A protein has these predicted regions:
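Conserved double-stranded beta-helix
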Residues: 51-52, 60-120
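Residue-level detector of conserved, well-ordered beta-strand and adjacent loop positions
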Residues: 17, 155, 168
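Non-heme Fe(II)/2-oxoglutarate
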Residues: 1-74
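A short, polar/charged loop/turn motif at coil->beta-strand junctions and beta-hairpin connectors
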Residues: 7-10, 79, 161
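Short, Lys/Arg- and Gly-enriched loop/turn segments at beta-strand edges
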Residues: 151-158
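Double-stranded beta-helix
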Residues: 161-216
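Catalytic core of non-heme Fe(II) oxygenases with the double-stranded beta-helix
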Residues: 90-149, 161-165, 170-185
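A short beta-turn/loop motif at secondary-structure boundaries
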Residues: 86, 158-159
Length: 216
């Protein structure tokens, strides 16, 4: 039996299979595709080809529900920061980066994909690692990692689409405790109900008010 807490403490990352059952993953995947078709996604600076979503409602509900079980699994007193989803599209590249403070402890989960195989992520062993470990994340599986410490990236996407969900947490007893709930940013729940242009304008206003854009 895997000791997730020990592995996460030692390696600063851990792979958790079946974090969501397939039906739940499909439901969240459907939410992201529906929002995309309604024009409620945005193009961020990090992945301009793809459609991105800050705190989509059903995904955020899943994020909040994850806090208690993940806290027990990792033996860390977590609080949620925010969730972020991307519908990755052909030609996208995720450049090597580490994450901002609100992403101290992060998880990336594949919700669905269309292509020959799932699009892998490369996870470095520290913030300067340029080689990294190639990791294929199955649908409903979760890779947790210290986002502010480990450099991560994805090479050029050759598939048709892939839906990725990111859960971001902070350690209540750590250096970034003040970033709980992403410093209380809460506009997104209502923004997903307005037209696409208003969504994009709200997103631009939000990112301009921060020192950096979301990193995933």
């Amino acid at each position: 039996m895997t000791d997730y807490a020990a592995e996460f403490k030692t390696k600063r990352m851990v792979y958790i299979p079946d974090a969501l059952d397939i039906n739940s993953a499909n439901e969240l995947n459907d939410e992201i595709h529906s929002l995309s078709m309604e024009g409620k996604g945005t193009s961020d600076e990090q992945c301009p080809i793809s459609h991105s979503f800050y705190n989509p409602p059903k995904c955020k509900q899943a994020l909040v529900k994850m806090v208690e079980p993940l806290s027990k699994l990792l033996n860390i007193d977590l609080d949620y920061s925010y969730c972020y989803a991307r519908l990755y599209l052909p030609g996208e590249v995720l450049k090597p980066h580490i994450d901002r403070e609100s992403c101290e402890i992060s998880a990336t989960m594949t919700l669905g994909y269309y292509g020959p195989d799932v699009w892998p992520i490369y996870m470095g062993e520290h913030n300067m690692d340029t080689k990294g470990n190639k990791i294929n994340i199955g649908i409903g599986d979760m890779l947790m990692y210290h986002g502010t410490e480990l450099r991560h990236w994805r090479e050029k996407f050759e598939g048709v689409w892939q839906t990725q969900l990111f859960f971001h947490f902070i350690d209540k007893n750590g250096p970034y405790a003040e970033h709980a709930q992403d410093k209380k940013v809460v506009w997104s729940e209502e923004s997903v109900e307005v037209d696409g242009e208003d969504y994009r304008q709200k997103w631009k206003q939000l990112t301009k008010s921060r020192t950096s854009t979301p990193n995933n």
